[in-house]
Structure formats: C-alpha cells, structure tokens
C-alpha cells in the first residue's frame, strides 16, 4: 500500500477518486463526477483541499480530505479546515486506513498553519476519529422541521462561520436557492425546503444573485444546525425518521491559543457545510 498526500489538480488522480467514490456509494445510487470534486477541492476561494489517499498499485483504495474555511473565533477571522470526506474501498476495510490517512492530513493542516480542524462525522466514522485521531466530541447538530424563516443566532457565540463574498458566491453556485430577507432557503423534496442559514451577523455582505425559484405555497422547512433560536413551530424530527447523525468533532491545532469549542458557544448552519 502506498500513501500519497496531494492536491487533486491531476486529472488522472481525480478520475481515480471518482471511481472510488462511485464504487463506495454504488448501492445507494449516488453518482460522483470530476466536476463536482473540482468545485469542492480546487475552486474553493479559501484554498485547495488537503487530500490524502492510499493506493494498491494504480487503484485508489482510500481517501480523506480537509476543506479550508474561515471562521470568526472571538471576533477574529481564523483559518481552519473541515474534515469533508473519508471513504475506503469495501475490499480494504478493517485495517484503520481512514484513521491513518486522517492523521497524516491533520499533520499537514497543522504544518500549513491552520488553527483547528473540525468535522461532522456520521455513525460509521465517528468512533475511529475520536479514538484514533485526536478529535473531541462536542455535540450533535439539531435536526428539526417546521414553518417560518425567523431563525436567529441565540446570543453571541464564540465560533461561527465567516463568509467572504467570493466564498459565498462559490458556495451557492451549484444548486437552486432563494433569498428571504437575510436568510437562504434551498430545494430539498416536494413540499420541503432546507433552511440553509441566516447571514444577519454579516449584514454588510452582498448576497450574490442565486438561482431563485418561487414555490407556489408555503413549504415545510428542514433545519440542521446549532446555536439558533427557532420559532415555536419547529419540532425535532421524530426518531423513527432515519437520518445520519451529525456528530460535531473538534481538534485544536493552535497550541492552545484558541478557546475550546463547546456545545454552547457555536453557531452553525446547513450553509456552513456541504450536504445541501
């Protein structure tokens, strides 16, 4: 097995990543393209992804990536990375490949000067990331449904995403969204919209022109996030409706210069990561 740390500018490397992802998610009917990975891994205005990959000969068998972002931490703009992807080929599981690749990628992020790494781990990857990769578990994001867009930050939080106009335009460029005041909504399923987030804390930010759509009737809203004050009309999604848990994990790379992230000092929204 060979381990390679790289940025995926190479077309051959990108093609191998697409083949791996499509094999891993084939039974779920998901299909990945090089164009999609270029968007997330190369075009990001905050910087190219840190990618760490394992090979068996010419075949990519495991992949981990960290996505550069900016956050406001105690009012200061801080460069960080988010653990975005971690996949391994079904034939090569059981030997902690993802943990090994994650640690290499995290070391590289620290070397490049990023202040912390965080992620939203699903039920499969969460135990290994906490046990073997130095992450601390913070909390699970709230998953709720209701009506209305009067969703606001619940007090002033220590950690929140910082958007430049270039980064926001990039984030909103690939799907259909609409603006309601300072809030952004997205299409999810018939009759349901995602509440992507509010940008009221960055009121000076020019929200870019987006691919507006206009529903004919009020839609139910899906909210995923942390640290918000929601209207009374929102309720937790019942346990019998299955969804992947969003386990928020954190690792400081600043040598203790930053305050610890806690479940009470974070404002986080769907807009801030890549699932919708």
Where are these regions (language model features)?
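Recognition helices and adjacent regulatory flanks at domain boundaries
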Residues: 31, 42, 51, 97-108, ...
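Basic, Lys/Arg-rich alpha-helical nucleic-acid-recognition elements, primarily the DNA-binding modules
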Residues: 13, 37-39, 85
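Conserved beta-strand in the GNAT
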Residues: 51-53, 59-68, 82, 87, ...
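Amide-forming acyltransferase catalytic core, primarily the GNAT-like/NAT-type
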Residues: 27-47, 55, 110-114, 123-205, ...
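Active-site/acyl-donor-binding loops of N-acyltransferases
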Residues: 117-156, 192-276
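Hydrophobic alpha-helical core bundles mediating ligand binding, dimerization, or RNAP-core interactions
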Residues: 17-21, 25, 102
């Amino acid at each position: 097995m060979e381990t390679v740390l790289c940025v995926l500018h190479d077309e051959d490397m990108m093609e191998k990543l697409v083949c791996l992802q499509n094999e891993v998610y084939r039974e779920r009917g998901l299909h990945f393209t090089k164009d999609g990975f270029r968007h997330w891994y190369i075009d990001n205005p905050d910087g190219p992804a840190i990618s760490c990959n394992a090979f068996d000969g010419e075949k990519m068998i495991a992949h981990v990536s960290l996505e550069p972002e900016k956050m406001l931490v105690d009012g200061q703009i801080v460069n960080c990375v988010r653990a975005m992807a971690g996949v391994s080929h079904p034939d090569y599981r059981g030997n902690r490949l993802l943990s090994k690749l994650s640690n290499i990628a995290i070391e590289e992020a620290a070397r490049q000067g990023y202040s912390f790494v965080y992620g939203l781990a699903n039920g499969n990857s969460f135990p290994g990331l906490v046990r073997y990769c130095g992450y601390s578990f913070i909390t699970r994001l709230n998953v709720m449904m209701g009506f209305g867009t009067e969703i606001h930050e619940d007090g002033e939080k220590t950690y929140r995403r910082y958007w430049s106009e270039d980064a926001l335009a990039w984030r909103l460029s690939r799907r259909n969204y609409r603006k309601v005041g300072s809030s952004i909504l997205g299409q999810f399923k018939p009759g349901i919209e995602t509440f992507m987030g509010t940008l009221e804390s960055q009121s000076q930010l020019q929200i870019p022109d987006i691919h507006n759509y206009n529903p004919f009737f009020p839609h139910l809203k899906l909210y995923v996030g942390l640290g918000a004050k929601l209207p009374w009309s929102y309720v937790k999604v019942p346990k019998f409706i299955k969804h992947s848990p969003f386990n928020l994990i954190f690792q400081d790379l600043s040598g203790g210069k930053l305050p610890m992230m806690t479940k009470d000092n974070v404002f986080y929204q769907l807009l801030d990561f890549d699932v919708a």
